UniProtKB/Swiss-Prot annotation:
Record-level Gene Ontology MF annotations: glutamate-1-semialdehyde 2,1-aminomutase activity; pyridoxal phosphate binding; transaminase activity
Protein's GO biological process: protoporphyrinogen IX biosynthetic process
Predominant localisation class: cytoplasm
HAMAP family associated with the record: HemL_aminotrans_3
The protein's name in its UniProt record: Glutamate-1-semialdehyde 2,1-aminomutase
Modified residue annotations for N6-(pyridoxal phosphate)lysine: K277
Annotated signal peptide: none
Gene Ontology CC terms, in alphabetical order: cytoplasm
Gene: hemL
Key words of the record: Cytoplasm, Isomerase, Porphyrin biosynthesis, Pyridoxal phosphate
Length: 443
């Protein structure tokens, strides 16, 4: 879905500096952004160019302030510029930015990941994409098989084989995959509908002895939010019955929905698990881990090669450790309460405006489906009245609330949200719901 940029922003004068910055950026950076969904392609208009953020609030180059409800796409569970995290980063940077050698802090971070999850050993990398790419390679090396089974609408980073029928930014731009992905890469990817156990059984029957692993998000968050509702346990059973591994992608859910991620919700342990976002406190870092017997197939002790110049970067590791130290039981109670409050505000406003909707929930993650009833898969999420979202989004933005700029993205809350923030969200929700009600499908 594409929206004319000129059709949005009811108060263009308040975005003049962002418009100027965006024009300059487009002359130097493809699309003017370094990740496609930031370009507002599915909602139209000019993305605010952010200068700073504190707590629950983003500030842009025009002097506008916004309550943040996407939290840098997930990692900022404690809000922005938390003093303890900033101090940890400052202290680490003072000792050096990169060593290319082991540090005790990276061991500490992996130990904390292991303590909270089913992981026995883990390795640090630089992004969620790198984590899933490495987990896929390891699964293939360990099993001696080539094919990977994934689900329509689940996004696992921009790895070639995993962009087939992906969600997130790919869904935003209406692409089934991406040019540049070879037929061979696509051919090694088996895609079935999410939450369809029979389709998974049938795929293994059709590709007997060929599938190395199933990869699935802990809870789907890139087709909007879709709760697995027991699906992961079925995947674990099917994978193990067929000699395959289960890779649980917790880049989004890990340490966001509980102290132990989605594993803390359903108790389903992946043979391999990927982490990102919260694990880095907002800096570029991620991890993948799993059973020691599988992880020991990685070089230098095993034959599967994986490496990274900046992996285990001391500044990013310090940020991650500080973030996880703050992520205690009280923090998750606050996140859940804030998500409940947000969901209630959204639903109340849409109900009063007579807009058919369902608030999709997976722990403290949520999204709005503009149709009655829960969506269970990508087809359900696409079948809703997605045309209502651009008007809904921009009404919020014009009233100082920054929601995710795509109907297929998840809304995130932080512990930094205040009573005043919720008053602002509630005040914005009424015109946003009215705008959604008035929206019509484009020709």
């Amino acid at each position: 879905m594409s929206v004319n940029a000129d059709s949005q922003h009811s108060n263009n004068s308040s975005h003049q500096a962002s418009e100027k910055a965006f024009d300059r950026a487009r002359s130097l950076i493809p699309g003017g952004v370094n990740s496609p969904v930031r370009a507002f392609g599915s909602v139209g208009g000019t993305p605010p160019f952010i200068t700073s953020a504190q707590g629950s609030t983003l500030h842009d180059v025009d002097g506008n302030s916004y309550v943040d409800l996407f939290c840098s796409w997930g990692p900022m569970i404690h809000g922005h510029a938390h003093p303890q995290i900033v101090e940890a980063v400052r202290e680490a940077a003072g000792h050096g930015l990169s060593f290319g050698a082991p540090t005790t802090m990276e061991v500490d971070l992996v130990e904390e990941i292991d303590r909270r999850t089913s992981v026995e050993k883990a390795r640090l990398v630089n992004s969620g994409t790198e984590a899933t790419m490495s987990a896929i390679r390891l699964a293939r090396g360990y099993t001696g098989r080539d094919k990977i089974l994934k689900f329509e609408g689940c996004y696992h980073g921009h790895v070639d084989s995993l962009l087939v029928a992906a969600g997130s930014g790919v869904a935003t731009f209406g692409l089934p995959d991406s040019p540049g992905i070879t037929k061979a890469a696509a051919g090694d990817t088996v895609v079935v509908p999410y939450r369809d156990v029979q389709a998974v059984e049938d795929a293994f029957a059709s590709h007997e002895g060929e599938i190395a692993a199933i990869i699935v998000e802990g809870a789907a968050g890139n087709m909007g939010t879709v709760n697995p509702r027991g699906f992961n346990a079925e995947l674990q059973r099917i994978a193990h019955e067929n000699g395959a591994l289960l890779i649980v992608d917790e880049v989004m859910t890990g340490f966001r929905v509980s102290e132990s991620g989605w594993y803390g919700k359903d108790g389903v342990a992946g043979d391999l698990t990927t982490f990102g976002k919260v694990v880095s406190g907002g800096l570029p870092a991620a991890a993948f881990g799993g059973k020691a017997e599988i992880m020991d197939h990685l070089a230098p002790v095993g034959p599967v090669y994986q490496a990274g110049t900046l992996s285990g970067n001391p500044v990013a590791v310090a940020s991650g450790l500080a973030s996880l130290k703050l992520a205690d039981a009280a923090a998750y109670q606050t996140l859940d309460a804030n998500a409940d409050a947000l969901a209630g505000i959204l639903s109340d406003a849409l109900t009063k405006a007579s807009v058919a909707h369902h608030i999709q929930r997976a722990g403290s993650m949520l999204s709005v489906r503009f149709a009655e009833g829960e969506g269970a898969n990508f087809a359900d999420m696409k079948a809703a009245d997605t045309f209502r979202y651009p008007a809904f989004f921009h009404a919020f933005l014009d009233h100082g609330v920054f929601a995710p700029p795509s109907v297929f993205e998840t809304w995130f809350v932080s512990t930094a949200l205040t009573g005043a923030d919720f008053e602002k969200i509630a005040a914005a929700a009424t015109p946003a719901a009215e705008a959604a009600a008035a929206a019509t499908p484009s020709a």
